[in-house]
Amino acid sequence: MINTLTSLRFIFALMVFGAHCYTIDKFFDTHFFKEGFVGVSFFFVLSGFIIAYNYQKKFSENKITKRAFWVARIARIYPLHWLTLFIAVALGNYVIASGAIDWLKHFLASLTLTNAYIPKADYFFSFNSPSWSLCCEQLFYLCFPFLIPIAKDYKKLLCVFLVSAILIVIGMHFTPETDIKGYWYVNPITRLPDFLAGMLLFQLYDRLKSKNITAYQGSIIEIASIALFLAFYLYAAEIPKVYR
């Protein structure tokens, strides 16, 4: 594992935490904290990088089967998800005004991690609301083995990423802002480009690691990356959400 990723996880986890604190105190209700939602995208990108880092070679060399990969991923997601879901049910006093049938529908959607496919807040944020991100991860894991042949050709993977990202931007442009969260932000299908971006970064990393990059060159790349991120973070409020 790449040790420097641990510090990045910490930083972006804090960003996500800060973005959710606006309900606690108006101190957090500022642009600086609100932009922390980009941390969610970071974790989806990181997922694509880590999964490719750990499994792409194994699939290419037939050292792991699709079934074994999926079983391992399910074992990683579902036990803890179900535990937190049942705790939420027990302690959350979750009630739906329309009655028991709707409660059961929402519960089953959450139980099976299909709630984020339904563009209604009372579904994708029901019970344990952060579980919508697990819906996305579940789709990423399902798709990954089928993306391996494309990933071997960097240009094909880049093309798939660009086309899907452009289509999503176009779709968001014609979607009322009140519907963007349900149709585009939490939807696992429209989050797939984040995962593809992570896979792309791994292909880049895999190519560069064999080259003799000096500490100076590495520092320049690092500083440029941080500067680009900070520029986005500071001026993001000037850019419509559709294009962010």
Where are these regions (language model features)?
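Functionally critical transmembrane alpha-helices in membrane proteins and complexes, commonly lining
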Residues: I2-F59, A75-T84, K105, A109-N115
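Juxtamembrane loop-transmembrane helix junctions in multi-pass integral membrane proteins
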Residues: N3, F28-K34, F69, R73, ...
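Aromatic-enriched alpha-helical transmembrane segments of multi-pass intramembrane proteins
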Residues: T6, T23, K105-Q138, L142-R244
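Residue-level detector of alpha-helix boundary/anchor positions
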Residues: I11, F32, I64, A72, ...
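Generic alpha-helical transmembrane segments of integral inner-membrane proteins
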Residues: L14, G18, L46, W82-A90, ...
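Juxtamembrane transmembrane-helix termini
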Residues: K26-D29, Q56-S60, V95-S98, P119, ...
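Transmembrane alpha-helical segments and their boundary/interface "anchor" motifs
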Residues: F37-V40, K57-N93, W103-S110, C135-Y141, ...
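Helix-to-loop transition at the C-terminal end of transmembrane segments
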Residues: L91-D102, F174-D179
